[in-house]
Amino acid sequence: MGILGLSKLIADLAPQAIRESEIKNFFGRKVAIDASMCLYQFLIAVRSEGAQLATVNGDPTSHLMGMFYRTIRLLDNGIKPVYVFDGKPPDLKSGELAKRAERREEAEKALKAATEAGDEAEIEKFNRRLVRVTKEHAREAKELLKLMGVPYVDAPCEAEAQCAALVKAGKVYATATEDMDALTFGSSKLLRYLTYSEARKMPVKEFTYEKLLQGLELNQREFIDLCILLGCDYCESIKGIGPKRAIELINSYRDIETILDNLDTSKYTVPENWNYKVARELFIEPEVADASAIDLKWTEPDEEGLVKFLCGERQFSEERVRGGAKKLLKSKKAQTQVRLDSFFQTLPSSPNAVAAAKRKAEEAKKSANNKKAKIGGGGGAGRGRRPK
């Protein structure tokens, strides 16, 4: 699910935190990619005549087709991807998973009704809703990546949290996912639409964590509380509080505890036994592997291994697979080129660095306001940060 309404809230209140770019602008960058999100996209999008691609035995291959060609496209553009796979979900996510199971059951009933009615559009719609990534899909994707010479990481828990840890450690430039909670986990950069097909012509949307904190006038902890109010995977949200009201409350009271002390409970219903404190801790200290100990290596592809794995039973075109393997080899050799900024040291990001950048921005803002006052500048008061 990610964080409900966060993307629009940032666009409205901190537009300076978002930049749209062409994929080629990320040449030379290492990027941690949410593998489960990608596989889900491929299972839905890579289809023939409305159905998933499959072997003669009916086993799906859409996820492998998508992973193979989209990864080649990234490498063609000089991007070095590392795929991060989900581990076990945290216990606090069980409520969200139960809701997903209910929605799946409803979709199955709707699909049955659409099939009986012969409504092809509805059949396709509900078939897509029933798509889910299995352990077998993930296992096959890992085998494919190994043959392609592309590294992957098995996260102990949430993939987005592990991606954020790799970014913080300076191992990669950004997290690539469609789930906004990568920012809640503290990833300094988030890339959306990076793995979309070229045909969709979607520019890559880059979010910068420090700039969104400055634009929203929040620190890391306050931003996490905002995300919990908006709605996350780990606990329910307060009914009746949408994005606009959530940011107003955080700006006024700075944390959920103080909000609850001042909330009009005749208007808003707080969930019973609300686990917001545990959710907050999951975002602050998620279960991740030590990123500094992870060694990321991009190696040469195994062309014969790829042909054996993808052709035959999986029915990929041998000519196209060999062509893809040659592109992989070519991009591996081309990666000797480097970005100019790679000559400078990349330091791991930290909450202290974010706070320092924020203080610097606030000091610059105060200085500018003082200068305006001296020369008589001014129309009304600007939007200031309320005291904690």
From Swiss-Prot:
PTM comment, free text: Phosphorylated. Phosphorylation upon DNA damage induces relocalization to the nuclear plasma.
Binding site for DNA: R47, R70, E158, G231, D233
Binding residues annotated for Mg(2+) 1, in chain numbering: D34, D86, E158, E160
Entry-linked PROSITE patterns: XPG_1, XPG_2
Protein residues bound to Mg(2+) 2: D179, D181, D233
Coiled coil: none
CDD domains: PIN_FEN1
Subcellular location: Nucleus, Nucleolus; Nucleus, Nucleoplasm; Mitochondrion
A GO CC term assigned to this protein in UniProt: nucleoplasm
Principal localisation: nucleus
UniProt cofactor note: Binds 2 magnesium ions per subunit. They probably participate in the reaction catalyzed by the enzyme. May bind an additional third magnesium ion after substrate binding.
Gene Ontology MF, one: manganese ion binding
Region annotated I-domain, chain positions: 122-253
Cofactor(s) named in the record: Mg(2+)
InterPro entries: 5-3_exonuclease_C_sf (IPR036279), Flap_endonuc (IPR023426), HhH2 (IPR008918), PIN-like_dom_sf (IPR029060), XPG-I_dom (IPR006086), XPG/Rad2 (IPR006084), XPG_CS (IPR019974), XPG_DNA_repair_N (IPR006085)
Source organism, top-level taxon: Eukaryota
Region (Interaction with PCNA): 336-344
Keyword terms: DNA damage, DNA repair, DNA replication, Endonuclease, Exonuclease, Hydrolase, Magnesium, Metal-binding, Mitochondrion, Nuclease, Nucleus, Phosphoprotein
Residue ranges, annotated region (Disordered): 355-388
EC number: 3.1.-.-
Region (N-domain) location: 1-104
Complexes and interactors: Interacts with PCNA. Three molecules of FEN1 bind to one PCNA trimer with each molecule binding to one PCNA monomer. PCNA stimulates the nuclease activity without altering cleavage specificity.
Similarity comment: family membership: Belongs to the XPG/RAD2 endonuclease family. FEN1 subfamily.
Role of this protein: Structure-specific nuclease with 5'-flap endonuclease and 5'-3' exonuclease activities involved in DNA replication and repair. During DNA replication, cleaves the 5'-overhanging flap structure that is generated by displacement synthesis when DNA polymerase encounters the 5'-end of a downstream Okazaki fragment. It enters the flap from the 5'-end and then tracks to cleave the flap base, leaving a nick for ligation. Also involved in the long patch base excision repair (LP-BER) pathway, by cleaving within the apurinic/apyrimidinic (AP) site-terminated flap.
The protein, known as: Flap endonuclease 1
